[in-house]
Each structure stands twice: as C-alpha cells, then as structure tokens.
C-alpha cells in the first residue's frame, strides 16, 4: 500500500507527471502556419495537506515568426492589433520557450517528477502551438509529454457542467473579469486556479488518496 503522506505529493498525485498550466494567444487556428503571439505558463505545487496551488508564473509577448500568417479576425479577437509594435516588448519564440522550459525543468526536478505535462483549457490547441513552435526553434529537449494533456474544459464539464472558461470559473465560485479575458497571462492564472479547485474538491470529496492504491498501479516510469 502507498503511504498516505507519500500519496499527498505532486509526484504521486499525477503518476510522476509535473503539471504546468499553459495558455497561448495566436493569430489563427493553424499551429503550423499562424503566429504565436503570447504565451504564459504557471507551475503548480502541493502543500503538506495534499492541496494544489499555483506556484510560479512566467509570461511573454512573442514576435511572429518569419512568414507567419496573421488572421485579421484572430487579431481582433485577442486585441493584438499590431503584432509588430515595439510597445508589446515581444521576444522571439526561441527566447520565450527556452526561458519557460528552464523554469519547468527546475521545478519539475525539485518535485521529483519524471516529466512535465501541459494543463490547458481546450488543451489540444495550446499543446499544438507549443509543439509547433518548439519544432520551428529546433528545441530537442521539450519537457512536455508529446501528446498527453490535462484539459480543464473536459474536467470542468464533468465537475461543474460548464466548458467555457468564464462560466466554469464562476460556477466554481471564482471571480472572472471578462474584460481581462484573452490575455494569456490572465487566462493562464484563471485556468490554474480552476484546475487546482477541481483537484482539491475531488480530494475533499474523498476521491484521493485511493483506498486500494498499490505500487503495481503507480509505476512512475511508465509515462505513456
């Protein structure tokens, strides 16, 4: 049987995965052709009671990569009307990703986790842009799982009957300012808070630790 205190660790809670909340703002829906314009990551930590909390935040405005497509409707949606404005303080994809990955690896190691995993709202979208940008930058040591994610749209649909981020947050008893929405920084912070709320409420309801949790079912080396 797994020791109760050991079960109340980030490593054991997510089978060796280190969850990192991500949100991106983009100039379209195609990760291969459309520009990545903003990215934010929030790491998570678990306290001695096994409750999950947001930890570190890292955020960048990003320069469109050379030849990137910029959909007018997407720019109007995000409010990033001029992606090339020097007032944005944007950095290259390469710089943004390397800094994020440096933080993720440091905190993943401190948590004794084997691999990072992306948490996002409609996670396939954010995951696809992160992976496409990593490939463009020829980054070989990407800390995130190549396809697995935790999707808060799915989880909040199960927990609260809502899949839209703003509605899910409000149903969960959280504040959500629609005027701040579609900023990667704000949306990541709210997604992190939502994910922590879902995980912590499930624990409070008795869903974790598992009653019959043996080591054969918790192989941290098997991360597929």
UniProtKB/Swiss-Prot annotation:
Binding of Mg(2+) 1 occurs at 23
Listed under GO biological process in this entry are: DNA replication proofreading; tRNA processing
Q: Which NCBIfam families match?
A: RNaseT (TIGR01298)
What does the record give as EC number? Answer: 3.1.13.-
**Which HAMAP family does the record associate with it?**
RNase_T
Q: Record the organism.
A: Vibrio cholerae serotype O1 (strain ATCC 39315 / El Tor Inaba N16961)
Site described as Important for substrate binding and specificity, located at 29, 77, 125, 147
Q: Which domain of life is it from?
A: Bacteria
The record's InterPro entries line, in alphabetical order, gives:
Exonuclease_RNaseT/DNA_pol3 (IPR013520), RNase_T (IPR005987), RNaseH-like_sf (IPR012337), RNaseH_sf (IPR036397)
Protein's UniProt name: Ribonuclease T
* Function noted in UniProt: Trims short 3' overhangs of a variety of RNA species, leaving a one or two nucleotide 3' overhang. Responsible for the end-turnover of tRNA: specifically removes the terminal AMP residue from uncharged tRNA (tRNA-C-C-A). Also appears to be involved in tRNA biosynthesis.
Locate the residues binding Mg(2+) 2: 23, 25, 182, 187
- Carries keyword Cell wall biogenesis/degradation? no
Question: What gene is behind this protein?
Answer: rnt
Tell me which Gene3D superfamilies the record gives.
Answer: Ribonuclease H-like superfamily/Ribonuclease H (3.30.420.10)
Cited PANTHER family: DNA POLYMERASE III SUBUNIT EPSILON (PTHR30231), RIBONUCLEASE T (PTHR30231:SF2)
The Exonuclease domain is annotated at 20-195
GO molecular function terms listed in the Swiss-Prot or TrEMBL record = 3'-5' exonuclease activity; magnesium ion binding; nucleic acid binding; RNA exonuclease activity, producing 5'-phosphomonoesters
What do we know about how this protein assembles, alone or with others? Homodimer.
């Amino acid at each position: 049987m797994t020791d109760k205190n050991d079960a109340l660790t980030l490593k054991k809670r997510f089978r060796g995965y280190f969850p990192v909340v991500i949100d991106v703002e983009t100039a379209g829906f195609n990760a291969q052709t459309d520009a990545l314009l903003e990215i934010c990551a929030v790491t998570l930590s678990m306290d001695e009671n096994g409750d999950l909390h947001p930890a570190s935040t890292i955020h960048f405005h990003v320069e469109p990569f050379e030849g990137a497509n910029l959909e007018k409707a997407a720019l109007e949606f995000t409010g990033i009307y001029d992606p090339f404005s020097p007032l944005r303080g944007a950095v290259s994809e390469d710089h943004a990703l390397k800094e994020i990955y440096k933080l993720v690896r440091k905190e993943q190691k401190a948590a004794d986790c084997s691999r990072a995993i992306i948490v996002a709202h409609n996670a396939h979208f954010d995951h696809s842009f992160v992976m496409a940008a990593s490939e463009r930058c020829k980054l070989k040591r990407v800390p995130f799982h190549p396809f697995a994610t935790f999707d808060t749209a799915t989880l909040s649909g199960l927990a609260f009957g809502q899949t839209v981020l703003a509605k899910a947050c409000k149903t969960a008893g959280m504040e959500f300012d629609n005027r701040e929405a579609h900023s990667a920084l704000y949306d990541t912070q709210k997604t992190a808070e939502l994910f922590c709320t879902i995980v912590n409420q499930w624990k409070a309801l008795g869903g974790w630790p598992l009653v019959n949790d043996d080591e054969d079912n918790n192989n941290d080396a098997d991360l597929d």
